[in-house]
Regions:
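Short Lys/Arg-rich amphipathic alpha-helical segments
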Residues: 49-50, 91, 106, 112, ...
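Conserved acetyl-CoA-binding loop-helix of GNAT-fold acetyltransferases
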Residues: 93-107
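Conserved acyl-donor/pantetheine-binding loop and adjacent beta-alpha core of acyl/acetyltransferases
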Residues: 51-84
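Conserved N-terminal entry element of GNAT/NAT acetyltransferase domains
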Residues: 1-15
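Conserved active-site alpha-helix within GNAT-family acetyltransferase domains
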Residues: 109, 115-117, 123-143
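A short, internal acetyl-CoA/4′-phosphopantetheine-binding micro-motif in the GNAT/acyltransferase core
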Residues: 83-93
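Short glycine/proline-centered loop/turn elements that form peptide/ligand docking sites
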Residues: 101, 126-129, 145-152
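Conserved beta-hairpin
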Residues: 34-56, 63
């Protein structure tokens, strides 16, 4: 579901203070300003147990690997950015992260049917987070190992 005030955010703790703060203080503000949209997983008492945020963006063709560049125009390439992504510590290691990403992928495929969206981008905080995304098929940018991408076309065929 899209985050709204009906969901309890106060007790959410993913172990990362910046992500906790984003959910509790900034996510709804950013939605109100049309900067990002945050989606939540919640339990039967409407406590948020995981979330991700999506925003539109673009990347330069030249930032991508040469194998990707060949088929792309020389203007900015439209993307959807998974900006924030977290699972409460009580639910980590139980597949909640992968379930949230599957949900995000479905939303992104829906968006791609309405507007041009070539890639999903993520900006990983560290190597461990980058490894998580790589296990799901993401690739690192050649010059920025913690910025990763996945083609939307690969999702469309997989979903």
């Amino acid at each position: 579901d899209v985050l709204s005030r009906q969901y309890q955010r106060d007790s959410f703790d993913c172990g990362q203070s910046d992500l906790n703060t984003f959910l509790k203080q900034y996510a709804i503000q950013q939605q109100g300003r049309f900067l990002s949209q945050t989606y939540v997983a919640y339990n039967d008492t409407k406590q948020v147990i995981g979330f991700y945020s999506l925003a539109n963006g673009s990347t330069s063709r030249d930032d991508l690997p040469i194998t990707e560049q060949k088929r792309l125009p020389r203007y900015p390439i439209p993307c959807v950015i998974i900006g924030r992504f977290a699972v409460d510590v009580g639910y980590q290691g139980q597949g909640m992260g992968q379930a949230l990403l599957r949900h995000a992928f479905k939303k992104i495929v829906e968006v791609s049917a309405l507007t041009g969206t070539a890639y999903i981008l993520v900006h990983a905080k560290d190597d461990a987070v980058a490894s998580f995304y790589k296990r799901l098929g993401f690739q690192s940018f050649p010059k920025e190992a913690l910025t990763l991408f996945l083609s939307v076309a690969s999702l469309v065929t997989a979903i």
